[in-house]
Amino acid sequence: MGRRKKIVQECETLMNTPEQIRNIAIAAHVDHGKTTLTDNLLAGAGMISDDTAGEQLAMDTEEDEQERGITIDAANVSMTHEYEDTNHLINLIDTPGHVDFGGDVTRAMRAVDGALVVVDAVEGAMPQTETVLRQALREGVKPTLFINKVDRLISELQEGPEEMQKRLMSVIADVNELIRGMTEEMDDIDEDWTVSVEEGTVGFGSALYKWGVSMPSMQRTGMDFGDIMDLERSDKRQELHERTPLADVVLDMVCEHFPNPIDAQPRRIPRIWRGDDESEVAESMQFVDEDGEVVLMVTDIGVDPHAGEIAAGRVFSGTLEKGQELYVSGTAGKNRVQSVGIYMGGEREEVEEVPAGNIAAVTGLKDAIAGSTVSSVEMTPFESIDHISEPVITKSIEAKNMDDLPKLIETLRQVSKEDPTIQIEINEDTGEHLISGQGELHLEVQTQRIERNQGIPVNTGEPIVVYREAPQQPSREVEGISPNRHNRFYISVEPLEQDIVDAIKLGDASMDMPELERREALQEAGMEKETSQNVEHIHGTNVFIDDTKGIQHLNETMELLIEGLEEALNDGPLAAEPVQGSLIRLHDARLHEDAIHRGPAQVIPAMREAVHNSLIDAEIRLLEPIQNVRIDVPNAHMGAASGEIQGRRGRVDDMYQEGDLMVVEGVAPVDEMIGFSSDIRSATEGRASWNTENAGFQVMADNLQPDKIDEIRTRKGMKLELPETIDYF
């Protein structure tokens, strides 16, 4: 029997014993060595050759991942590991580290119970380290730490034992500071989740040279850091690997310190699902009941050239089998399961069934998207997966040949299904479509894949930055009148407090929640009690309050009012950009008693006009997206690096020394950061490494607003004259 087939059989057997299952993700800042580490784990499990581990990058299966040398998609693999005489099934997801692909990390965290955070010993904790930790902790996923590239401290930087210990302890302290800050507010975590060398939740080593150590492994092998430094310096890395193999150290840590599904699900389910906690479904999810109703949370959609769409996700309850007819949240009817399987590296292996507590690969769920709840009974869906950052860059995309247009439209729909952080706007009339993503690289990869994988030659436009509009002060009460003059609505707008905006963004307050729970969440974020009781609708980060009392026919008209409200908020009055962070109050209404005179053609424009005029009275402004920028550069080039930020309307917040490099930290508008890569390379003679991270939106300077508004209105084919009442720039 082939080695691979044997592993599949072992996995199938272990799937039925949740105590021996560990669902884990490996996450880190870009280039800190996740995929090389994953190769080592695969080699340790006998799934790839030990000789090629670290070079094969077995989890980077796409051509563009191999070319760019970075992980773009999260990849799944199941493997086995024997720990303390017991065989364990480890379902592992290798995630991207580049900020543009953070959506894949967020979705992966929903499927797992533990996150192995990898940090480069030389660079230390970086911006994306903080982001992946936040993504893990928000989903109730327990972290451990592996400090990689320790060989560089010994051989390259020639650090002595004291210097090295100081550096490693500093990395651990930084990571623990992040963990403490994020878990303080989490009531459902009653244990200390900080990492510790003594406890065995920290490992050290070199993924490239395949050796690793932890406190338990040093006690077991009798090796200490002195031995490691001697072997590393005398270039006896193979002996080091043989005496203390990396895979054993890391997988032992995974088995010992990460929870199994039986321990994890009772804590995680209330965090990610807001249904009735007394129901049978709740009970079978919390107890990982393989005989309960089937509940699958889809975290990823991929396409196989032979099998078609494959939905990957975590089975929280029941047992998935071929032929089952399952509900998909947000769609009518049922989908029939064509096959179930598990992942072995880049390939899917079909199995008879996948029980609760495992990660499965399913075909046949044609209506599912990343984030869908799939179940054998109709149920409250899981909380939507909140992505840390929203799209900030848009490009137009069109087929070079008109004959390819239908295929391109279909492909774009598929792209947004596979990656919910990509937003697609399809205009079937003009043939020009818009694709929005997290950054230039994100869009570049998606458009190249459309050309390469689908064979559709495309033209793309210049990158366009996504803006927002927001009120700056409370407005007066404004009247909106319907075209037939029989219906009147009295509206005011005010800025929504930032804490309430954050609560909505994080999913702590939404219209999907029971009303009482939503009220409490909004009050906790700072909303007044009476206001929270009158919340009628939440759209984006805008809240609509109905302050009216006993108005006849209002209930039956409310749906049209909300439609008009959403139209006004989707296209703000300045430049038809989305409005955010506003509280809209309906104070009073006058409605015609005859329904025929208060139909859509009357109510929607009246509401839209009232909201727009209120926003103008509230001195609405354009907001631009900004990015945090960090540049690591030799001292001689520090001035050039800070000049690159300042020359882009940016601001330098901090400069400090870290090792032999200077670190420059600041913020800059996304619009000005287009083309930054090539400019910083030439300014620093290729000596700089840098990171950017989306940091939300800020009000654009008043002197820049008119020109930017004109530019956007021109691009959208709108008339250039703003409403006369906009006279505050």
UniProtKB/Swiss-Prot annotation:
<feature type="modified residue" description="Diphthamide">
    <location>
        <position position="597"/>
    </location>
</feature>
<dbReference type="InterPro" id="IPR005517">
    <property type="entry name" value="Transl_elong_EFG/EF2_IV"/>
</dbReference>
<dbReference type="GO" id="GO:0003746">
    <property type="term" value="F:translation elongation factor activity"/>
</dbReference>
<dbReference type="InterPro" id="IPR014721">
    <property type="entry name" value="Ribsml_uS5_D2-typ_fold_subgr"/>
</dbReference>
<dbReference type="InterPro" id="IPR004161">
    <property type="entry name" value="EFTu-like_2"/>
</dbReference>
<keyword id="KW-0963">Cytoplasm</keyword>
<comment type="similarity">
    <text>Belongs to the TRAFAC class translation factor GTPase superfamily. Classic translation factor GTPase family. EF-G/EF-2 subfamily.</text>
</comment>
<dbReference type="InterPro" id="IPR027417">
    <property type="entry name" value="P-loop_NTPase"/>
</dbReference>
<feature type="binding site">
    <location>
        <begin position="94"/>
        <end position="98"/>
    </location>
    <ligand>
        <name>GTP</name>
    </ligand>
</feature>
<dbReference type="InterPro" id="IPR031157">
    <property type="entry name" value="G_TR_CS"/>
</dbReference>
<dbReference type="GO" id="GO:0005525">
    <property type="term" value="F:GTP binding"/>
</dbReference>
<dbReference type="InterPro" id="IPR000640">
    <property type="entry name" value="EFG_V-like"/>
</dbReference>
<keyword id="KW-0547">Nucleotide-binding</keyword>
<feature type="binding site">
    <location>
        <begin position="28"/>
        <end position="35"/>
    </location>
    <ligand>
        <name>GTP</name>
    </ligand>
</feature>
<dbReference type="Pfam" id="PF00009">
    <property type="entry name" value="GTP_EFTU"/>
</dbReference>
<keyword id="KW-0648">Protein biosynthesis</keyword>
<keyword id="KW-0342">GTP-binding</keyword>
<dbReference type="GO" id="GO:0003924">
    <property type="term" value="F:GTPase activity"/>
</dbReference>
<feature type="domain" description="tr-type G">
    <location>
        <begin position="19"/>
        <end position="262"/>
    </location>
</feature>
<dbReference type="Pfam" id="PF00679">
    <property type="entry name" value="EFG_C"/>
</dbReference>
<dbReference type="GO" id="GO:1990904">
    <property type="term" value="C:ribonucleoprotein complex"/>
</dbReference>
<protein>
    <recommendedName>
        <fullName>Elongation factor 2</fullName>
    </recommendedName>
</protein>
<dbReference type="InterPro" id="IPR005225">
    <property type="entry name" value="Small_GTP-bd"/>
</dbReference>
<dbReference type="InterPro" id="IPR009000">
    <property type="entry name" value="Transl_B-barrel_sf"/>
</dbReference>
<comment type="function">
    <text>Catalyzes the GTP-dependent ribosomal translocation step during translation elongation. During this step, the ribosome changes from the pre-translocational (PRE) to the post-translocational (POST) state as the newly formed A-site-bound peptidyl-tRNA and P-site-bound deacylated tRNA move to the P and E sites, respectively. Catalyzes the coordinated movement of the two tRNA molecules, the mRNA and conformational changes in the ribosome.</text>
</comment>
<dbReference type="InterPro" id="IPR041095">
    <property type="entry name" value="EFG_II"/>
</dbReference>
<dbReference type="Pfam" id="PF03764">
    <property type="entry name" value="EFG_IV"/>
</dbReference>
<dbReference type="InterPro" id="IPR000795">
    <property type="entry name" value="T_Tr_GTP-bd_dom"/>
</dbReference>
<dbReference type="Pfam" id="PF14492">
    <property type="entry name" value="EFG_III"/>
</dbReference>
<dbReference type="Pfam" id="PF03144">
    <property type="entry name" value="GTP_EFTU_D2"/>
</dbReference>
<keyword id="KW-0251">Elongation factor</keyword>
<dbReference type="InterPro" id="IPR020568">
    <property type="entry name" value="Ribosomal_Su5_D2-typ_SF"/>
</dbReference>
<feature type="binding site">
    <location>
        <begin position="148"/>
        <end position="151"/>
    </location>
    <ligand>
        <name>GTP</name>
    </ligand>
</feature>
<dbReference type="GO" id="GO:0005829">
    <property type="term" value="C:cytosol"/>
</dbReference>
<dbReference type="InterPro" id="IPR035647">
    <property type="entry name" value="EFG_III/V"/>
</dbReference>
<dbReference type="InterPro" id="IPR004543">
    <property type="entry name" value="Transl_elong_EFG/EF2_arc"/>
</dbReference>
